[in-house]
Amino acid sequence: MILLKIIHIIFVMIFLSIFFPKSLYASTSLIRKDHIIQKNLENFDDQSAYALGVSLGNYINHSFREQKRLGVILDKNSLLSGIRDSLSGKTILSDQEISMELIKLEKKLKYFEDIVLKKEAHNNKIQGDLYIKKMLKKKDARHTSSGLVFFIKKKGSGKFLHDSDVITVHYKGSLINGNEFDNSYKRGQPLSFSLDSVIPGWIEGLKYIKKGGLIKLVIPPKLAYGETGVPGIPGNSTLIFEIELIDIQSK
């Protein structure tokens, strides 16, 4: 949660104030005066403090960009003032007021996050359906009643798969916009697992090839990660996998 990230940053900055008090107050002084003072980083402590400060600043900027994406814009100067006042022990809000404001902010972020995610998921579903229709027009396209679209690049040989089989595969997965979210080839190592432990689109699609086979799957969200998605894969995403079936081991 974005709010928790900000709270984490505040705690880290308090930690820095204990070990690098001069560096921290020098930074807040620059903020108050709104001008730049060049400083030579002559020793390890100065360089470490500066590096941590830049890292924390980048972290805060990232959090603020994510909030802006949700339509929530917080004032950076007010955030920094709150940190400075906390370090000095002179805050303009009581502990109870601070707790109430944080709860309100968390609810606000959650509300707008839900709206944005639902909107993105709705758009992903529309774009995914259009992409599948486009793929179905290709002459070598095949599809199933469940909505899976596949292209057999190489059939392979031997026996077909069963749900309980342990398979070894190389694969790469991407979204319909071309963004790649996984690639075993780049890791330089194939993956082994039981077929019944993966998404339905894989279970259904891989049964059309044998050992040594190669297949391309276009998987609608209901056969992948559904409306909610997973980290790196937004809700209602249609997925594209190119899978090489290297080995099959029956249990």
From Swiss-Prot:
One of its GO terms (molecular function) is peptidyl-prolyl cis-trans isomerase activity. Disulfide bonds: none annotated. It comes from the Bacteria. One of its GO terms (biological process) is protein folding. PROSITE patterns: FKBP_PPIASE (PS50059). Transmembrane segments: none annotated. It is an enzyme of class 5 (isomerase). Keywords: Isomerase, Rotamase. SUPFAM superfamilies: FKBP-like. Signal peptide: none annotated. Its EC number is 5.2.1.8. It catalyses: [protein]-peptidylproline (omega=180) = [protein]-peptidylproline (omega=0). InterPro entries: PPIase_dom_sf, PPIase_FKBP_dom, PPIase_FKBP_N, PPIase_FKBP_N_sf. It holds the Pfam family FKBP_C. Residues 164-251 form the PPIase FKBP-type domain. PPIases accelerate the folding of proteins. It catalyzes the cis-trans isomerization of proline imidic peptide bonds in oligopeptides. Belongs to the FKBP-type PPIase family. This is FKBP-type peptidyl-prolyl cis-trans isomerase FkpA. It comes from Buchnera aphidicola subsp. Baizongia pistaciae (strain Bp). The lineage of its organism: Bacteria, Pseudomonadati, Pseudomonadota, Gammaproteobacteria, Enterobacterales.
